[in-house]
Amino acid sequence: MINAPSAAAVCALCFFAGIQQEKPEDKPQEKPSCPMHEQQKISPEEQHQEGVVQRGDRVMGFSHERTAHHFLLYSDGGAIEVEANDAQDTASRDAIRSHLGHIVTLFAAGDFSAPMLIHAQNPPGTEEMKRLRETIRYKLENTERGARIRITTKNVEAVHAVHKFLRFQIADHLTGDPTEITKAP
């Protein structure tokens, strides 16, 4: 009767055989193209940004790389604008319009779960925006390459909350948009 080696013994044998055949230049920590090695080099901020992009693409339904986000602060609230980079990219344009239409419905109901899913945290200002939702208006406007959500309110506390929310978006999406109040278009 022949005894078959256990799975653990086979794994151990393969592991040790692999080590003996391994050349120093093959070790992951010495290969610049090794994904695990590269991941170790990434700062926590870069890891967060990668997560925002990956989660955002999944939640929003369109690519960050093929679109541009802008967050603008106005004296009566602000705006969220998303546009396809390529005027011929009607798939991104349509996905943007669909997503922002959905966001208008959610935000008007005081539901800010979509930004939390993208940013892995509740953005500043959302608790106040939820509490003051009856004083805030969200209007969807189609643009040539996407859409805009115009956020307006006459409530001073709500304006401050909207501005906190938009400033967070500017920073977390790395848009480079001004964080000061500008004139509405």
Language model segments and positions:
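Intrinsically disordered, low-complexity terminal tails/loops enriched in metal-binding residues
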Residues: 11-185
